[in-house]
Amino acid sequence: MTTNRLVLSGTVCKVPIRKVSPAGIPHCQFVLEHRSQQQEAGLSRQAWCRMPVIASGQLLQVLTHSITVGSRLTVSGFISCHQGRNGLNKLVLHAEQIELIDSGD
């Protein structure tokens, strides 16, 4: 199987970290908090998660430049496992597309 696709909407809950790799590729890392009501087995349940997101490359940097804590986004991309400094593995969403959700203000 080769399908690896995730679409998640939420609110940026940690200050974005912007870096440039030694190869000159810009990266923006942030955490997206998702909260929703979902249906499962005919019952309503609360869904909640915090997903680390990394957006790489020049095209996405134009979009991520305006992202701050509290920004509402829909992010689509693929997930991959990253090992943290503490040695624990975590899932990370590698953004391929980012859409700002209009707050209606």
Curated annotation (Swiss-Prot):
InterPro entries: NA-bd_OB-fold, Primosome_PriB/ssb, Prisomal_replication_PriB. Keywords: DNA replication, DNA-binding, Primosome. Pfam families: SSB_1 (PF22657). Belongs to the PriB family. The keyword DNA-binding applies. Signal peptide: none annotated. This is Replication restart protein PriB. Homodimer. Interacts with PriA and DnaT. Component of the replication restart primosome. Primosome assembly occurs via a 'hand-off' mechanism. PriA binds to replication forks, subsequently PriB then DnaT bind; DnaT then displaces ssDNA to generate the helicase loading substrate. Residues 1-102 form the SSB domain. One of its GO terms (cellular component) is primosome complex. GO terms for biological process: DNA replication, synthesis of primer. Involved in the restart of stalled replication forks, which reloads the replicative helicase on sites other than the origin of replication; the PriA-PriB pathway is the major replication restart pathway. During primosome assembly it facilitates complex formation between PriA and DnaT on DNA; stabilizes PriA on DNA. Stimulates the DNA unwinding activity of PriA helicase. GO terms for molecular function: single-stranded DNA binding.
